[in-house]
């Protein structure tokens, strides 16, 4: 059995590292919008998980029912967070298979 060429292995590792860095940058440059109540409440989140905007349609603002509004904001946030995780899995998943792991769990 022949020995693997170390320079070839190193070159492949460097190429994979560059691909991972590019995917990470793409994720960080992205933003997603999570929503609740068919878009009446939306949360915009960056790829790093930072909430950059919250929009609430006045139709869902009822001073007598603050709990529903709180639930909708929480639901929109969770939806946005899931979309960031899905984006990370989409971008990093194929690359992480080379490492035998699930990189999506990092986000």
Swiss-Prot record:
Domain of life: Bacteria
Gene3D superfamilies tied to this protein: Nucleoid-associated protein YbaB-like domain
Signal peptide span: none
Gene Ontology CC, one term: cytosol
Keywords on record: Cytoplasm, DNA-binding
Subcellular location(s) of the protein: Cytoplasm, Nucleoid
Family annotation (SUPFAM superfamilies): YbaB-like
InterPro entries xrefs: YbaB-like_sf, YbaB/EbfC
Family annotation (Pfam families): YbaB_DNA_bd
Molecular function in Gene Ontology: DNA binding
Function: Binds to DNA and alters its conformation. May be involved in regulation of gene expression, nucleoid organization and DNA protection.
Self-association state and partner proteins as the record states: Homodimer.
Family note: Belongs to the YbaB/EbfC family.
NCBIfam families hit by this protein: DNA_YbaB_EbfC
UniProt name for this protein: Nucleoid-associated protein CE0210
Organism expressing this protein natively: Corynebacterium efficiens (strain DSM 44549 / YS-314 / AJ 12310 / JCM 11189 / NBRC 100395)
């Amino acid at each position: 059995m022949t020995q693997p060429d170390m320079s070839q292995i190193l070159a492949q590792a460097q190429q994979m590292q560059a691909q991972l860095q590019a995917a990470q940058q793409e994720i960080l440059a992205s933003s997603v919008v999570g929503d609740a109540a068919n878009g009446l409440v939306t949360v915009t989140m960056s790829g790093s998980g930072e909430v950059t905007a919250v929009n609430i349609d006045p139709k869902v603002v009822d001073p007598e029912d603050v709990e529903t509004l709180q639930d909708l904001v929480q639901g929109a946030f969770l939806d946005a967070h899931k979309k960031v995780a899905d984006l990370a899995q989409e971008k990093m998943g194929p690359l992480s298979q080379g490492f035998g792991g699930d990189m999506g769990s990092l986000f």
